[in-house]
Amino acid sequence: MDKLKIIMEKGTERLKRGFAKMVKGGVIMDVTNAEQARIAEEAGAVAVMALHKVPADIRKAGGVARMAPVEKIQEIMDAVTIPVMAKCRIGHEAEARILEALGVDMIDESEVLTPADPFFHIYKKKFTAPFVCGARNLGEAVRRIWEGAAMIRTKGEAGTGNIVEAVRHVRLVNENIRLIQRMTDEEIYGVAEKFAEPYLRLAFSVKEISGLPKRVLENEPIYEGFTYREIVEGIYKILLEIKKLGRLPVVNFAAGGVATPADAALMMAMGMDGVFVGSGIFKSSNPPKMARAIVEAVNHWDEPDVLAEISREIGEPMRGQAIEELQVRMEERGV
């Protein structure tokens, strides 16, 4: 890679991460039409996520969940002045290209939609639009960052109104970061090798089908022209940055199961940079009040007296689901 290309890529990554930092400390709300988008903006949302259905309805409908209709996304973009994000399926580069052409402010390569690629996520560095991606653990987070994600969010378990999986993912990432900080650089390189292994799945599957040993050559490309060793080196650099910073090098939001102001405050208390709220707003009994209360909870997460006042007379939250009752675990989608 020539020097000019390296400088341009670094500049693009800086711009993408800069946009993500602009929404830090705020609430991003899922909306399905212009009216909901205006409610979110009036409540103080820093951005909205355009979908055809909120996650709870996607879960209920079943079938294949795809990118929202172009007309719906445009309707939402025309209705508000705050940034508009939209979801594409995991690995569906064509959907992502359409969203980029529409001019959305950020693309969410999301497990809430039905995955399109069973092996890989999109190589996000090929795009000018910034991406946000979900992660259950540090390995998933680092892989997405290496691919070019400008923002990470917990996966949680979308559409359930149950915060437990988001808490699990935050704790797993935070504890793994603390472990990385206690490791030597040599030990961290071993972690990078482990974290890079999912990129080998396609190559190993093809070798197995062909009756060949499950191994790759040193110069054998396995993903977007990169060899396994090149991917390891890239992940290793990110892990060293994490060791130095004591956190992810990109903005890190909570998502998946946030249904009340208390849920939002809990996520902020656990070190999150902000909160995505999917079904929790528009599946509650009073969306405008719930939206305002969750925004206030993120702003005052460390003030219990204020949180108590915020939580008064906001109506009923969305009906929650126990994780054990779920037939589909969206959080398990992706690699």
From Swiss-Prot:
NCBIfam families: PRK04180.1, pyridoxal 5'-phosphate synthase lyase subunit PdxS. It is an enzyme of class 4 (lyase). This is Pyridoxal 5'-phosphate synthase subunit PdxS. In the presence of PdxT, forms a dodecamer of heterodimers. InterPro entries: Aldolase_TIM, PdxS/SNZ, PdxS/SNZ_N, RibuloseP-bd_barrel, Thiazole_synthase_ThiG. It comes from the Archaea. Its EC number is 4.3.3.6. Keywords: Lyase, Pyridoxal phosphate, Schiff base. It catalyses: aldehydo-D-ribose 5-phosphate + D-glyceraldehyde 3-phosphate + L-glutamine = pyridoxal 5'-phosphate + L-glutamate + phosphate + 3 H2O + H(+). D-ribose 5-phosphate binds at residues 30, 159, 257, 278-279. GO terms for molecular function: pyridoxal 5'-phosphate synthase (glutamine hydrolysing) activity. Belongs to the PdxS/SNZ family. The active site is at residue 87. The keyword Isomerase does not apply. The keyword Lyase applies. Pathway: Cofactor biosynthesis; pyridoxal 5'-phosphate biosynthesis. D-glyceraldehyde 3-phosphate binds at residue 171. Catalyzes the formation of pyridoxal 5'-phosphate from ribose 5-phosphate (RBP), glyceraldehyde 3-phosphate (G3P) and ammonia. The ammonia is provided by the PdxT subunit. Can also use ribulose 5-phosphate and dihydroxyacetone phosphate as substrates, resulting from enzyme-catalyzed isomerization of RBP and G3P, respectively. GO terms for biological process: amino acid metabolic process; pyridoxal phosphate biosynthetic process; pyridoxine biosynthetic process.
